[in-house]
Swiss-Prot record:
SUPFAM superfamilies: Ribosomal protein L29 (L29p). Belongs to the universal ribosomal protein uL29 family. The gene is rpl29. This is Large ribosomal subunit protein uL29. InterPro entries: Ribosomal_protein_uL29 (IPR050063), Ribosomal_uL29 (IPR001854), Ribosomal_uL29_CS (IPR018254), Ribosomal_uL29_sf (IPR036049). One of its GO terms (biological process) is translation. PANTHER family: 60S RIBOSOMAL PROTEIN L35/50S RIBOSOMAL PROTEIN L29, LARGE RIBOSOMAL SUBUNIT PROTEIN UL29C. The lineage of its organism: Archaea, Thermoproteota, Thermoprotei, Desulfurococcales, Desulfurococcaceae.
Amino acid sequence: MKPDEIRKMTKEERLRRLNELRLELIKLRMQARVGTLTNTARIRNIKRDIARILTIMREEELGISRK
């Protein structure tokens, strides 16, 4: 997910997407523990998407404007 896509979302959409990503991360971590996870890079990508969403939400709280 690109930062521009996240910035175009409403606050509610961001929160919903954040919750979806967190649930997916939990499921993938469980698969990794069991040994059924095939795409390990997916965990890293989800963690980065979560960080992007949280960063953009924090920027808006502080009034920092980006492109």
